[in-house]
Swiss-Prot record:
This is tRNA-specific 2-thiouridylase MnmA. GO terms for molecular function: ATP binding; tRNA binding; tRNA-uridine 2-sulfurtransferase activity. Its EC number is 2.8.1.13. The record marks H132, Q342 as: Interaction with tRNA. PANTHER family: MITOCHONDRIAL TRNA-SPECIFIC 2-THIOURIDYLASE 1, TRNA 5-METHYLAMINOMETHYL-2-THIOURIDYLATE -METHYLTRANSFERASE. Residues 155-157 are annotated as: Interaction with tRNA. It comes from Petrotoga mobilis (strain DSM 10674 / SJ95).
Length: 367
C-alpha cells in the first residue's frame, strides 16, 4: 500500500476494531467511519432478537474504540435517506415480486465499498479498509485484482462482498483475510478492547427483531389469504399472503388435503396470490439462470463452483455466459430449493470469486 492514509469502516464490533488496531500498528493514518443506516428510534421501539449492526450501542462502541486506539479522525455519517432508497425500498420491492432479497449484498456495493470511497477521497485517503474476512490480491493467473475466500472458512465473507464493483478492488484493504476469528478475539483481549467478546451481528440492521412480516406490514405491504395448489393443480390449502413465504419453506400453510405429506413452497405467483407446493424430491434443480451479473473475471464457459445462498456450500457446476450480464449454471448434482432473488456466486477451484448475480425465476426451468 503506497498511501499511508486509510479510511476504516468501524461498525463497533470486534473485527473492525482489531483491523483498525493492526493498521495503526503498521503506522497508517487511520480515519474511522461509522454509518447510521436507520433511526435510533427503531431500536428503542423494537427489541433486538439477535445482535444486529448499526444500533445506537454500536455507535457508542465505535466511538469508544476510536478514542482508545487514538485514531486520527472519526466520523459518523448519516445515510438513512440513501439507505432507504437503495436498500429498504429494494427489500420491499423484491418481496412484492414474490422473491427473497439479500440486502447486505447491495449495502456492501453501494455504501460500505461505494460511498465510503467517496468519503475517503474527500479526506485524501486512497484506501478503504474493513474487518471483513476475505483476501484481496493481484492475480497473475487472471491479470487483475481479485477477491477470494479468507483462511477462516467459518467466517469467510467473500460471498457477501461478491457484488461489489470490481473497479474498487485496487483501493480496498482487508487486514483480517489471513487470520482466524480466535486470533482476533485474542488480540482484542490482550489490548483491552471493550468489544473483545461482543457477539457477531446476525440480523438485518433495519429489522432488529427479524420479523419480516411485521416490517412489511408496517411499510404498507399487505396481502390477503390465498390458495395453495399441488403440482397437479389441486387446491389443497390456504396461506396467509404470498409475501410471507420463500421457496423451500414448509411452515405457515393450512392444509385440508395431503396434510400427512412433507410439502415445500415450490413456486410463488404474486399477481394471483397463489403458492404451489411440492414434496421434497421435487425441490431439486440442476440448472439456474443468473442475471445482472457482476464479473470480477470475464469468461465464456468454466468449470467452477456455485453458492446460491449465504448458508450453503459451493457446489461443482459448469457455468456458461449466455449474454453480457447473464449466466447459465449447470450443477453436477441437483441442489435444493433454488430461490429467486437470492445471489449466486461463482468461484474457481482455489476460492477466487469470478462473478455474482441474481437468480431470476422468469428465466428458470423447473425448480
Amino acid at each position: 500500500m503506497s498511501n499511508k492514509k486509510v479510511l476504516m469502516l468501524m461498525s463497533g464490533g470486534v473485527d473492525s476494531s482489531v483491523a483498525a488496531y493492526l493498521l495503526k500498528e503498521q503506522n497508517y493514518h487511520v480515519i474511522g467511519l461509522h454509518f447510521k443506516t436507520v433511526s435510533d428510534v427503531v431500536f428503542s421501539l423494537i427489541p433486538e432478537k439477535k445482535k444486529v449492526c448499526c444500533s445506537p450501542s454500536d455507535t457508542q462502541d465505535a466511538l469508544k474504540i476510536a478514542d482508545k486506539l487514538d485514531l486520527d479522525d472519526f466520523q459518523i455519517v448519516d445515510i438513512k435517506k440513501e439507505f432507504k432508497e437503495k436498500i429498504i425500498d429494494y427489500f420491499i420491492k423484491t418481496y412484492k415480486e414474490g422473491k427473497t432479497p439479500n440486502p447486505c449484498m447491495l449495502c456492501n456495493r453501494f455504501f460500505k465499498f461505494g460511498k465510503a470511497l467517496e468519503i475517503a477521497h474527500s479526506y485524501g485517503a486512497d484506501w478503504v479498509s474493513s474487518g471483513h474476512y476475505l483476501i484481496k490480491e493481484y492475480s497473475n493467473k487472471y491479470s487483475t485484482y481479485i477477491i477470494k475466500k479468507g483462511v477462516d472458512q467459518y467466517k469467510d465473507q467473500s460471498y457477501f462482498l461478491s457484488y461489489i464493483d470490481k473497479n474498487t478492488l485496487p483501493k480496498l484493504h482487508f487486514p483480517l483475510g489471513n487470520m482466524y476469528k480466535v486470533e482476533i478475539r485474542d488480540i482484542a483481549n490482550k489490548i483491552g478492547l471493550s468489544v473483545a467478546n461482543k457477539p457477531d451481528s446476525q440480523e438485518l440492521c433495519f429489522i432488529p427483531d427479524n420479523d419480516y412480516r411485521r416490517f412489511l406490514k408496517e411499510n404498507g405491504v399487505t396481502t390477503e389469504e390465498g390458495k395453495v395448489y399441488d403440482l397437479e393443480g389441486n387446491e389443497i390449502g390456504t396461506h396467509t399472503g404470498y409475501m410471507n413465504y420463500t421457496i423451500g419453506q414448509r411452515s405457515g400453510i393450512s392444509y385440508y388435503k395431503n396434510a400427512n405429506v412433507k410439502l415445500h413452497v415450490y413456486k410463488i405467483f404474486p399477481q394471483k396470490n397463489v403458492l404451489i407446493v411440492a414434496p421434497t424430491e421435487e425441490m431439486y434443480s440442476k440448472e439456474l439462470i443468473v442475471q445482472n451479473v457482476n464479473f470480477f473475471v470475464d469468461f465464456k464457459e468454466i468449470e467452477g463452483f456455485c453458492r446460491v445462498r449465504k448458508k450453503s456450500e459451493e457446489k461443482p457446476a459448469v457455468v456458461k455466459k449466455i449474454a453480457d450480464h447473464t449466466l447459465k449454471v449447470s450443477f453436477k448434482e441437483p441442489i435444493f430449493a433454488v430461490t429467486p432473488g437470492q445471489f449466486a456466486t461463482i468461484y474457481d477451484e482455489s476460492g477466487v470469486v469470478l462473478a455474482s448475480g441474481v437468480i431470476n425465476i422468469k428465466e428458470m426451468g423447473e425448480v
